[in-house]
């Protein structure tokens, strides 16, 4: 009974969420679009003609923002283990980023070129066990960072979702070895009770 009450409370809060209503009105697939928009505007992440890789893309709101920002001369490559309704201008790969074959498929569509921006909103299947969820989230963030080491152009940027916890500082130090500057972002569209943060690596060193 408690879980049913919790579900009803979540649904009510979701329906009354200003960002949810705004996303529905403006045609974005989720409220997450405004997280990326806020960070992108603050830190000037996008420019026309960029090649963007969007990890954990489904349902596609970050890819929508990326497509709007890079324009017709840009490219957006989206990846998620969940299906995503097609977006004109975006190339979507469905699969688990942890599997070598899926990574190889992404490398194939990149066709030997590197990205100008990597954005990752990947999240594990949350269990409610904070320590476990945080550890799995950090593992996905580390995979995204490893991808950047090989496939992000020097001097370019990397935005990744992480969860506050015991491994947070260690992961930030990993990023600091690869980027000239690493900053923390908590956009307004990120719910107050959420432990999620975003780390932004600016100007990849190598």
UniProtKB/Swiss-Prot annotation:
Record keyword Oxidoreductase present: no
Binding site for S-adenosyl-L-methionine: 60, 62, 80, 96, 121
Top enzyme class: transferase
Subcellular location: Cytoplasm
Keywords from the named record: Cytoplasm, Methyltransferase, rRNA processing, S-adenosyl-L-methionine, Transferase
The UniProt record lists the keyword Amino-acid biosynthesis: no
Active-site residues annotated for this sequence: 161 (proton acceptor)
Domain of life, per lineage: Bacteria
One Gene Ontology molecular-function label: rRNA (uridine-2'-O-)-methyltransferase activity
InterPro entries given in the database record: RNA_methyltr_RlmE, RNA_MeTrfase_FtsJ_dom, rRNA-MeTfrase_E, SAM-dependent_MTases_sf
Major subcellular location class: cytoplasm
One GO CC term, this protein: cytoplasm
Catalytic activity: uridine(2552) in 23S rRNA + S-adenosyl-L-methionine = 2'-O-methyluridine(2552) in 23S rRNA + S-adenosyl-L-homocysteine + H(+)
EC numbers: 2.1.1.166
PANTHER family registered for this protein in UniProt: RIBOSOMAL RNA METHYLTRANSFERASE, RRNA METHYLTRANSFERASE 2, MITOCHONDRIAL
Similarity section: Belongs to the class I-like SAM-binding methyltransferase superfamily. RNA methyltransferase RlmE family.
Function recorded in the entry: Specifically methylates the uridine in position 2552 of 23S rRNA at the 2'-O position of the ribose in the fully assembled 50S ribosomal subunit.
Protein name: Ribosomal RNA large subunit methyltransferase E
Biological source species: Nitrosomonas eutropha (strain DSM 101675 / C91 / Nm57)
Lineage of source species: Bacteria, Pseudomonadati, Pseudomonadota, Betaproteobacteria, Nitrosomonadales
């Amino acid at each position: 009974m408690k879980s049913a009450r919790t579900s009803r409370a979540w649904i009510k809060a979701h329906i009354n969420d200003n960002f949810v209503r705004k996303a529905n009105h403006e045609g974005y697939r989720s409220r997450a679009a405004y997280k990326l928009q806020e960070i992108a505007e603050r830190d000037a992440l996008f420019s026309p003609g960029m090649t963007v890789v969007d990890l954990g893309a489904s349902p596609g709101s970050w890819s929508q923002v990326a497509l709007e920002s890079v324009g017709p001369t840009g490219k957006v490559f989206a990846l998620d283990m969940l299906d995503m309704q097609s977006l004109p201008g975006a190339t979507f790969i469905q699969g688990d980023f942890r599997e070598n074959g899926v990574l190889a498929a992404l490398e194939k569509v990149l066709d030997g070129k590197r990205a100008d921006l990597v954005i990752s909103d990947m999240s594990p299947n949350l269990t409610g066990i904070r320590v476990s969820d945080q550890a799995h989230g950090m593992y996905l963030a580390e995979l995204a960072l490893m991808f950047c080491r090989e496939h992000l152009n020097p001097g370019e940027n990397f935005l990744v979702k992480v969860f506050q916890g015991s491994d947070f500082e260690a992961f930030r130090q990993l990023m600091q070895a690869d980027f000239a500057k690493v900053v923390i972002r908590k956009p307004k569209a990120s719910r107050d009770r959420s432990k999620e943060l975003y780390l932004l690596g600016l100007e990849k060193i190598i």
